[in-house]
Swiss-Prot record:
One of its GO terms (cellular component) is cytoplasm. It comes from Salmonella schwarzengrund (strain CVM19633). This is Cysteine desulfurase. GO terms for biological process: cysteine metabolic process. Pathway: Cofactor biosynthesis; iron-sulfur cluster biosynthesis. It is found in: Cytoplasm.
Length: 406
């Protein structure tokens, strides 16, 4: 069956607008995806008709809001095939989820002389928390290098592990190159050395199904806003045996069992002890609607359509004069490129004049930029609502820029 892209586009009101007098071609979903009516309406309805503070409220609105919030936890658990909803922590996004692991599990389990392995393609959110932890603890941060095609040099990975390796923290899909890393092989190698595994799934969950049990990772984290949901909400999955042992890293309301000025404080059980303060309940409701939305379309169908569009885009972009494409032939979601020696910001500004939205800069991946020897790249990302026509507009726009700038 043909993917109903026009029907999908009709669900996203922002796609009907114009930019600089031209129809918007939104090719920046890897930074943040647009929101369908179903998500907007669900969050709006909650604030209009169902809002109340969750937890401990005896009145109807509070009880209903709490139930709705916990139902989304169960729904997200099914979405990634966790064993239990109580393995999922609501966080503000991928960045907070990784910081939670670093400051809770990491503080308890990393010692001087230990090491953590990351890769050269990581987003800053999966670099900086580990740098900070290693500096605090006197541990070593080891880095998996890249091949020129944007895949990891996996032949070097085994030598990076030793009996002091405590964690492999790896992106599922690169936010710049679109590289999908071979997680089963990497996780199996980590297991041989007794290391835990954290997966940054921010660029994966919208493109295909994720099964955390099949992966056998210890931590998996993703953001709602890249999954067509609201900003300020994400999911951290932690294997139950680890989560129950982890101490809280933020204190306040909701995460306690008892508080005494003379006898100290005891914690709520996990996952609630990691959710201090008033939660983003509206965002949680919106995340549930986003999961419903992509599930109703079918992640397999979304993935097939996006891969067809990706192949077309790579073929067409390769014909643009003086373009450099970065990353492997087989990729998910994103195409990073530069045009001649022109700065990415200049190219992106011209494209914006043509109504085309792309991301420019270092994409929170400065070590990757340094590896390629460039200060910045343009990045076009392809989502389920993008079309062949929008790809054609990008190609025409870049060809026009090349003619204008040389």
């Amino acid at each position: 069956m043909t993917f109903p892209v026009e029907k999908v586009r009709a669900d996203f009101p922002i796609l009907q607008r114009e930019v600089n007098g031209l129809p918007l071609a939104y090719l920046d979903s890897a930074a943040s995806a647009q929101k369908p009516n179903q998500v907007i309406d669900a969050e709006s309805a909650f604030y209009r008709h169902g809002y109340a503070a969750v937890h401990r409220g005896i009145h109807t609105l509070s009880a209903q809001a709490t139930e709705s919030m916990e139902n989304v936890r169960k729904q997200a658990s099914r979405f990634i095939n966790a064993r239990s909803a109580e393995e999922l922590v609501f966080v503000r996004g991928t960045t907070e989820g990784i910081n939670l692991v670093a400051n809770s599990w990491g503080t308890e389990n990393i010692r001087a002389g230990d090491n953590i392995i990351i890769s050269e393609m990581e987003h800053h959110a999966n670099i900086v928390p580990w740098q900070m932890l290693c500096e605090r603890k006197g541990a070593e941060l080891r880095v998996i290098p890249l091949h020129p095609d944007g895949t990891l040099r996996l032949e070097t990975l085994a030598a990076l592990f030793d009996d002091r390796t405590r964690l492999l923290a790896i992106t599922h899909v690169s936010n710049v190159l679109g590289t999908e890393n071979p997680l089963p092989d990497m996780i199996a190698l980590a297991r041989q050395h007794g290391a835990k595994v954290l997966v940054d799934g921010a660029q994966a969950v919208m493109h295909h199904a994720v099964d955390v049990q099949a992966l056998d990772c210890d931590f998996y984290v993703f953001s709602g806003h890249k999954l067509y949901g609201p900003t300020g909400i994400g999911i951290l999955y932690v294997k139950e045996v680890l989560l129950q042992e982890m101490p809280p890293w933020e204190g306040g309301g909701s995460m306690i069992s008892t508080v005494s000025l003379t006898q100290g404080t005891t914690w709520a059980k996990a996952p609630w002890r990691f959710e201090a303060g008033t939660p983003n309940t509206g965002g949680i409701i919106g995340l549930g609607a986003a999961i419903d939305y992509v599930t109703s379309l079918g992640l397999d169908k979304i993935g097939d359509y996006e891969q067809m569009l990706m192949r077309y885009a790579l073929e067409q972009l390769a014909q643009v004069p003086d373009i450099t494409l970065y990353g492997p032939a087989q990729r998910l979601g994103v195409i990073a490129f530069n045009l001649g020696k022109h700065h990415a910001y200049d190219v992106g500004s011209f494209l914006d004049n043509y109504g085309i939205a792309v991301r420019t800069g270092h994409h929170c991946a400065m070590p990757l930029m340094a590896w390629y020897g460039v200060p910045a790249m343009c990045r076009a990302s392809l989502a389920m609502y993008n079309t062949h026509e929008e790809v054609d507009r990008l190609v025409v726009g870049l060809t026009r820029i090349h003619r204008l700038l040389g």
